[in-house]
Amino acid sequence: MTWNPDQYHRHREARNAPARDLMAMIPALPCRDVVDLGCGTGEHTRTLAERFPDARVLGLDSSAQMLAKADALGLPNLRFERGDILDLAGEYDLMFSNAALQWLPDHPALLARLWDHLRPGGVLAVQVPANHDHVSHRLLTETANEFAAELGGFTRFGTAHGASPVLTPARYAEVLDGLGAGEVTALSKVYPVVLPGAGGLLDWTRGTALVPYLSRLGAEDGERFVAAYLERLRSRWPGERVYYAFTRVLFTARKPG
């Protein structure tokens, strides 16, 4: 996928609020190694490096465009690397991931895989968007179905009616308990975003949800796709104000030891 960091940061404050809450959930702990999985442009990775100045802090992301912005955030204990979360190597005392794991399937298996990279006594801290059932996403899937030929049948979750990999807080807690985790906290929180009509909501989705679709379409088909999606959004939100109740799931867990 081709990410646009400038587009993503057009709603910087709304996107940063859940990350700050996740940071606040991380308990005090000695850290030698910290990793930020799906670090994007690296602002939160830098915050981790400042909070744990004696630790080696790694920001990992698959997007060259995002990491190009991150390279400017120099600190002696901070480095960035391009790579896939599923190819993670090494062991860590803190594994942090803000709004990234929702792009990966099978979260019970994913958490088990990440858990193997967490040192005893270490903490896993994760935030994922949980708005897959929001009307805006359903309308996006409808638009993808309309463009099935151009997209080769692709939709965000694999099939036209595929389920999101994101779980409920209770299910995440159960999975973590099954891994032997202690001190588990898992919660859901709504972060309201007020947007200027359907056009504002389209601008919001351009930073995230639209990315995998537009990455698969040429310029002309991409413009047609956006126009068809915007028409659906305007039909649902004809006014000049959209109240977007953005739900997020946040959880932390400590590995005994």
Task: Describe the predicted segments one by one.
Residues 96:
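A conserved beta-strand element that flanks and buttresses the S-adenosyl-L-methionine
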Residues 33, 122-123:
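Short glycine-centered segments of the SAM/dcSAM-binding site in methyltransferase folds
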Residues 1-32, 43-47, 66-69:
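Conserved class I S-adenosyl-L-methionine
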Residues 108, 115, 123-196:
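Conserved catalytic/acceptor-binding region of the Class I
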